Amino acid sequence: MPELPEVETSLRGVEPYLHGKIIKQIVVRTQKLRWAISDELQHMQGAKIVALSRRAKYLILHTTQGDILIHLGMSGSLGILQENQQPAGKHDHVDLITQDGTVLRYNDPRKFGCWLWTKNAEQHELITRLGPEPLSESFTAAYLFARSRNKTVAVKNFIMNNDIVVGVGNIYACESLFMAGLHPELAAQNLTEKQCERLVKVIKEVLAKAIIQGGTTLKDFIQPDGKPGYFAQVLQVYGRKDEACNDCGTIIEAKVIGQRNSYFCPHCQMLPR
C-alpha cells in the first residue's frame, strides 16, 4: 500500500507538470473506486490548478473550482504523459487533462483509492479528523507520551492510528520500531518519555529517508516518472522473515498484530516481562 513517502514522492513528481495549469477535461473510466467518483470532477473544465499539497496519504489539487482529493488506496499510482501518447490500459481509471495536453493518469489495479471533489479540502471529514503530520514540529515526544497514557493497545497499532499521527503505515512502523529498539507488542501506555523521544526521532528519520529514496516499491507502486521506489533496498526488518538481523544476526520473526504482518528482531526489540 502506498504510504506517506510514496504519496509525497507522487506529489513532488507531478507538481511541476500541473501547477498553474488549466483543466481541459477529466476522463473517468470507472465510476466507483473505494467510493463513487464525484460527479463534479467531470464539470471542471476551465478550472486552474493553483496549488498541490499532501495531507496524510491524500494528495490534494487545489483549483479555482474547489479541491480534488486523491488517495492511492492499496495499489494506486500516478503518472504524467502527453495527450494521445499512450492508450489507457485496463487499470487506468482517471485521466486529468490540461489545456496544454499534459495528462495526469491514475492507475489502480485493486480500485481501493479515491478521487473526490470538495469545496475546501481542509474542511472535508476525511481531513478534519486526522492527527498531526509526523514530519511537522507539532509531532513531538511530549505529544506522543501524553497521547499514549492509559492506552493498552500495542505500540505498533498506536503509531499507525491516524488519530494519533498520520502516514506511519505498516512498512514504516516496523522499520521505526526496529530503529527505536521497541517490540511492536509493547503496550503504548508503558512507553517512557525517553522511549517516546527516541521513537519520534526515528519515525522522522525513517520517513525522511524513504522520501529521498522515492518511497518503497514492493509490488504496484511506481513514481510518476515510471521508476520504482528504492527504499525497499535498505529495509531492516520489513519483509525479511527468517533472515538474519543486520545488527545482531538473530533471525527476524513475523507476527500478525492488528491484522497486519509485523516484522521484528526478538533480540534487538525485546518485550519486557
UniProtKB/Swiss-Prot annotation:
UniProt-recorded name of the protein: Formamidopyrimidine-DNA glycosylase
Record keywords, A-Z: DNA damage, DNA repair, DNA-binding, Glycosidase, Hydrolase, Lyase, Metal-binding, Multifunctional enzyme, Zinc, Zinc-finger
Positions bound to DNA: H91, R110, K151
Zinc fingers typed FPG-type, residue spans: 236-270
Highest taxon of source: Bacteria
Coiled coil spans: none
Active site per UniProt: P2, E3, K57, R260
Subunit structure: Monomer.
CDD domains, A to Z: EcFpg-like_N
Record's catalysed reaction(s): Hydrolysis of DNA containing ring-opened 7-methylguanine residues, releasing 2,6-diamino-4-hydroxy-5-(N-methyl)formamidopyrimidine; 2'-deoxyribonucleotide-(2'-deoxyribose 5'-phosphate)-2'-deoxyribonucleotide-DNA = a 3'-end 2'-deoxyribonucleotide-(2,3-dehydro-2,3-deoxyribose 5'-phosphate)-DNA + a 5'-end 5'-phospho-2'-deoxyribonucleoside-DNA + H(+)
Protein family membership: Belongs to the FPG family.
InterPro entries assigned: DNA_glyclase/AP_lyase_DNA-bd, DNA_glyclase_Znf_dom_DNA_BS, Formamido-pyr_DNA_Glyclase, FPG_cat, MutM-like_N-ter, Ribosomal_uS13-like_H2TH, Znf_DNA_glyclase/AP_lyase, Znf_FPG/IleRS
Protein role: Involved in base excision repair of DNA damaged by oxidation or by mutagenic agents. Acts as a DNA glycosylase that recognizes and removes damaged bases. Has a preference for oxidized purines, such as 7,8-dihydro-8-oxoguanine (8-oxoG). Has AP (apurinic/apyrimidinic) lyase activity and introduces nicks in the DNA strand. Cleaves the DNA backbone by beta-delta elimination to generate a single-strand break at the site of the removed base with both 3'- and 5'-phosphates.
Species classification: Bacteria, Pseudomonadati, Pseudomonadota, Gammaproteobacteria, Pasteurellales
GO BP: base-excision repair
Cofactor notes: Binds 1 zinc ion per subunit.
Cofactor(s) the protein requires to work: Zn(2+)
